């Protein structure tokens, strides 16, 4: 009723640091190794956009609403294209040496650097997913979403859903306010974003997101919806990275690519990222396209590690395996900052506790194992690229979910047991 979308709070007091000298030493050490490590160096040079060409070559770049894994014009929306045509600055969060943020400018589409620049997810969701090959159009779409406070993944996925409906004659120009909503139509993309933001005409339907929009449209459109728990898929195809399928299904808030490390980060003993994550008890790599007890155990450990990041407010692009800050340095930094004497064991339990608490919250709202699924399209084959014919095997996937539940101390229905809650110090949930 108040039309309130958000409350922004900006603190003015300085944050207390328990051991400022030690914290400064750790920060200097990390800053020094950032440019020596290829993972963080790559983030500085090309940002997350570096994933565009690699994922397309690997056959896992979502293309045409996840029908394909390779985009034949990926070069046009790549980091290299951005660097050459529209990049004006490399920026970052306060005091961060990685500086993975892009600032771009385009005279043709009035794109301003103050809105930053498109990340990988945006390049894919407005690019390959919708068959758009114009980096400046994608930058404009990104700016519009930032200005209107729209999520670029869900917006791109919802528009791709509508484009597939249009292609299948479920939607016509009469439905879309005269917009020729076909894959590859650049102006249609921008016009639709505007309509979604202002809830004008057909935009009022798409503003609900693809799942609810499909319920309004009907006519078989539900088969083009790619969501988990109502949230659209990010731009990583689980048919080439099986753990990502588990991440999508298990995330308490719906499909999320930032729940745990992706399979390709730890697929070989020779990888820096694999070597550095071994102290967590991950001693053997596993093929990205394979389900096994080893794969599930690795995912369980890494989901706890990632969950701890969220609890502590640590950027996923700083610690291993995604970047170069070692496990010891993460723990030492946390202790220096807080004055605690914590350990790897304790922070892993913090992550596990947060995961269990989220499951209990969702269970209260009616979510359980029936909701830990991925769209049927992912259980079908990719239609092109290096992984043509690959699919996420449904039976193996469901067995992996059950194994994960067991490893986490959850029931077959995905609910933490009384014993697990007590072990995690969440007895108040049992008593309640």
Language-model-detected regions and their locations in the chain:
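Extended C-terminal regions of large enzymes
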Residues: 1-432
């Amino acid at each position: 009723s108040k039309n309130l979308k958000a409350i922004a709070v900006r603190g003015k007091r300085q944050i207390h640091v328990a051991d400022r000298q030690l914290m400064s030493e750790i920060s200097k050490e990390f800053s020094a190794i950032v440019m020596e490590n290829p993972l963080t160096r790559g983030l500085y040079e090309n940002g997350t956009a570096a994933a565009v060409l690699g994922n397309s070559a690997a056959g896992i770049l979502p293309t045409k609403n996840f029908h394909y894994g390779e985009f034949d014009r990926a070069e046009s929306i790549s980091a290299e294209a951005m660097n050459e045509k529209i990049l004006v600055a490399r920026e970052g969060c306060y005091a961060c040496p990685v500086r993975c943020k892009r600032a771009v400018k385009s005279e043709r589409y009035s794109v301003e650097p103050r809105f930053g620049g498109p990340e990988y997810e945006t390049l894919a969701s407005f690019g390959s997913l919708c068959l758009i090959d114009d980096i400046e159009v994608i930058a404009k779409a990104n700016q519009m979403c930032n200005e209107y406070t729209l999520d670029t993944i869900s917006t791109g996925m919802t528009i791709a859903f509508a484009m597939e409906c249009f292609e299948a004659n479920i939607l016509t120009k009469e439905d879309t306010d005269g917009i020729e909503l076909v894959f590859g139509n650049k102006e249609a993309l921008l016009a639709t974003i505007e309509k979604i933001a202002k809830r004008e005409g057909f935009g009022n339907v798409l503003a609900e997101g693809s799942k609810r929009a499909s319920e309004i449209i009907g006519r078989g459109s539900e088969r083009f919806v790619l969501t988990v728990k109502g949230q659209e898929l990010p731009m990583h195809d689980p048919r080439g990275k099986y753990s990502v399928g588990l991440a999508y299904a298990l995330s308490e808030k719906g499909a999320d690519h930032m729940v745990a490390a992706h399979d390709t980060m730890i697929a070989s003993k020779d990888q820096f990222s694999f070597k550095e994550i071994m102290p967590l008890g991950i001693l053997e790599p596993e093929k990205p396209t394979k389900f096994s007890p080893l794969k599930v155990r690795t995912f369980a450990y890494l989901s706890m590690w990632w969950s701890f990041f969220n609890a502590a407010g640590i950027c996923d692009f700083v610690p291993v395996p995604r970047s170069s800050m070692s496990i010891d340095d993460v723990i030492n930094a946390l202790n220096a900052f807080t004055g605690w004497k914590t350990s790897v064991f304790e922070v892993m339990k913090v992550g596990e506790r947060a995961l269990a608490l989220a499951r209990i919250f969702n269970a209260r709202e009616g979510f359980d194992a029936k909701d830990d699924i991925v769209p049927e399209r992912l259980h079908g084959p990719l239609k092109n690229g290096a992984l043509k014919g690959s699919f996420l095997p449904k039976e193996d996937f469901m067995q992996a979910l059950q194994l994960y539940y067991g490893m986490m101390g959850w029931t077959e229905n995905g609910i933490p047991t009384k014993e697990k809650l007590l072990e995690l110090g969440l007895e108040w949930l049992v008593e309640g």
